[in-house]
Amino acid sequence: MKFQKLGNTDIDVSVVALGTWGLGGGSVWTDGDSTVEDAKHLLDICHEHGVNYIDTAPVYGTGVSEELLGKALKGRRNDFVLQTKCSLNWRNEGGNFHYERDGYTVNNDTRASAVKKDVEDSLRRMGTDYLDSVIVHYVCGSFPVEETVGALENLVREGKIRTYGLSNSQPADLAAYQEAGGNVSVVQEFFSILSPFHGREYFDLCKKYNTVFQTYGVLEEGFLTSPAFMEREFAKTD
């Protein structure tokens, strides 16, 4: 397995990460409910193949993915780089409506108080006293960037998080966070061979700021591994 530094930090991460959307259960996150044993099995496979970068989010099953990971990580927390997210929550404490699912109303809130509470909730659910990386799940233009950056930097100083990043953003957002005094280590965006255009816009900026460009959706939610795609004969000009 190859490794790289996470942005300007001293954190070594594998170039392949485990995304844990599917551990969330419920109506959308996976086909069935996952267990702690499922999570342990995933971590075992990751460790066997040298993958140390684990990505989750509070809204994956409204807390379920984080809780399962927390239990599965007991006794081996230091073997993995743990990344979760902030901004999307179901506390009904303000922010912008994002979606309704499984009986919960999820809002997007990047105010300082919300970011701090998101991180504290994640620490509690996962039973750890620090998070290696926290990503703003959906960048929100309704609240000042300076406020969000200030909250994230405070959490770094407090030792609750080691670094932070952005997702579902625009290149201008990365520049704005940096210009507001931030140090964005990772940008996580949708990118695949079928949908490369949005990601390409980040490459020069990521190089400028030494920010890792992390992709999700690289298999187009399974389409690129489906029989319909794998067995298709493409023309030479396709």
Give the residues covered by each predicted segment.
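A short, structured active-site edge motif that brings together acidic residues
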Residues: 79-91
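Beta/alpha (TIM)-barrel catalytic core signal, keyed to glycine-rich beta->alpha loops juxtaposed to Asp/Glu
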Residues: 3, 139-238
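N-terminal binding-site loop/beta-alpha segment at the start of enzyme catalytic domains
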Residues: 1-81
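Surface-exposed, active-site-proximal loop segments in enzymatic domains
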Residues: 91-107
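Conserved, mostly hydrophobic/aromatic
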Residues: 6, 18, 46, 54, ...
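Active-site groove signature of glycoside hydrolases
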Residues: 123-142
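A structural motif
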Residues: 51, 128-131, 161, 184
